[in-house]
Amino acid sequence: MKRFFLLSFFLSFGLYSQDYFIVNDGVKTKEYGNTAFTNANIYTDKGVISNSTLIINDGKIINYGRNIDIPKNTVIYDLGGRYIYPSFVETFSNFGIEKYSRSDFSRSSQYEPSRKGYYWNDHILSDYNAFDNYIYNKSDADKMRKMGFGVVNSNSNDGVHRGTSFTVALIDDKNESYRLIQDKSSEYYSFSKSSRYNQSYPNSTMGAIALIRQLFHDANWYSQGVSNTKDLALEALIENKDLPKFFDAGEKLNVIRAAKLSNEFNLNFVIKGSGKEYENIRELKKFDNTIIVPINFPKAYDVSNPLLNKKLTINQLRYWNQAPANLKILDENNIEFIVTSSGINRTDDFLENLRTAVKHGLNIKKAIESLTIVPARSLNLGDKLGKIEKNFLANFIITSGPLFDDETEIDENWVKGNRHIINPVNTVNFDGEYEININGNNYNLIISNSQDNINTRVKKDSINLKSKTSLQDDWLYLTIFDEYKSKASYAQLSAKIISENTISGLGIDFNNDEFKFKTTSNRKLKKSKGEDLRLEAQKVSKLTYPNVGFGLTEVPKSKSIHFKNATLWTNEDLGIVENYDILISKGKIVEIGKDINTPPGYEVVDATGKHITSGIIDEHSHMAASSINEGGHNSSAEVSIMDVINPDDVNIYRNLAGGVTTVQILHGSANPIGGQSAIIKLKWGSEIEDMFFEGAAPFIKFALGENVKQSNWG
């Protein structure tokens, strides 16, 4: 009975001797009074404040800094030199939203909308509010908090116009009114159709671009009050016109297309990118859009099989090599960016990949801002989220060290003042070898990993004894079994961790008698480093233009050239002439003739024995475009190939090798009236805008016959 009473006393003594005592049966605190975090290194937007204190109350930051007064009756956490950073803000997620499936999909075409009283196209869902279909998901919230996020902005990821998103705090044991930060936080757009509806149009990227254009024009017209009918989708679009606007572009060329739409309608889209922004950085820097960047870097390929190695493309290898430098390149080009966890499959990969980006040159301050200040500002929440600042929400993470050190772990994530323990930690490292005298015998207690999942070994002389250990908030509870005394003989200890090498407490010895003890470690254990499998930053290969096979290390520049003694095929009345000279400058022919004097600044090329002809013009081509057909309507005259030029298409290179210099890229023959064509110069390695002929006459594709009837399709 005495053993049971004393053990109960020890346990209760341990509970009421902690820094806090409101709850002890879970990982979250329900404390609404002042809470202080002392001996912390606090990261602020102005730098790290060492040996400082953070005070929070009722879900908000009250004060922070060195030598600040701590109010009476404050719960105090001594962080022992750990770090505090603002919790991260996720701008792109579908947290709490069920993914839609097209359960009633039909192979037959649907040309008319199914929603009466709404927009003429079912894929415009501007009236949809994601919060109406939201259910808090504890499992997903736990994953997000482990990556460092405290707040998520969630949308449905469905439709060309996806409606509005919402913003919630990731707190498990609260109701929705407490979690909710914004029930309508932003509008979302994409180039992808809804999975919920079967309407055929659009079925191409250029169709989606045309649909978005038409939507904005229709909304402008509708807002003038001249419509005789009510359109609930347009009314929602107009009502939400002042919300931040996000665009899920994804594919790298679609990022440029979304940015162009943003400029065209004087909108400031925050655009979700592909992670390959470095490949079209020349175009991106001409716009002023913030880019949401995934960091799901590709894993290294297994190259042990020489047969499979042949399947690897230069594009795949370059992506693996260059992707970690993407954020650095964006920063160097003054392009604002937000880091997203979208695409991350393992929670551990998020911080690991972020650290990889830092090793590849990303500025640490910019890295933190891309997770905190910038996403908060993009959601119009810059006055309450993303900083350690007075009156801001008490959203912060506690880490074991500087965030970007390889060994650092996120220990806790506090969201609106609610504690979530990620990595249970004892703040004092008391690893070492201790000696305790029990019943006249010395027992060696060897403790390791005391700041994580503690390990203990007990030895008497050279004999290892069985033991059981638990650690609760600086209190060590230990049971020692000494079978050499008696099979039923055991001693129990309750020890307070005083410092890094001292423990003291009360115990019950093998004779069931009480005793006090205090012991100091006589040997500090060295922590084994083990094998570090993390890779340092590899050398990043140089970009080519385009960044594919046969890409150029430098974009060709226009030169002034004098070709001498060539055979010219003039395609004029002059016919074919031999031993002629030709001068070109600024991309145009300046002069042809015999024995022309070389002007100053011209490069001379001896073309003796060579033939020079005009470049071949291909009037009917379907190359170098991301989409060719928009078959969702019988007439798709509103779409344009110019919106979907693909400058990376290797067919540009191949056609140049065959003498082709100009092509007209036509819409396909999916419908009687197709889309507008594009006439381009085959400039391999150039930006899209540099490929268009200025002032070229517009053309459109019409078609008849088997393709249009679709008689041989499917």
Regions found by a protein language model. Give the residues of each.
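Acidic, glycine-enriched loop/beta-strand segments at the rims
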Residues: 23-31, 42-53, 66, 348, ...
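Polyanionic/metal-chelating signatures
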Residues: 137-277, 409, 415, 496-502, ...
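Beta-sheet ligand-binding and adhesion/scaffold domains
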Residues: 92, 437-444, 475-547
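Histidine-rich, glycine-flanked metal-binding segment
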Residues: 19-22, 27-33, 46-87, 102, ...
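His/Asp/Glu-enriched, well-ordered alpha-helical/loop segment
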Residues: 25, 108-119, 127, 294-399, ...
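Active-site core of metal-dependent hydrolases
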Residues: 51, 155, 228-323, 337-338, ...
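Tryptophan-anchored aromatic micro-motifs
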Residues: 37-41, 425-446, 452-461, 467, ...
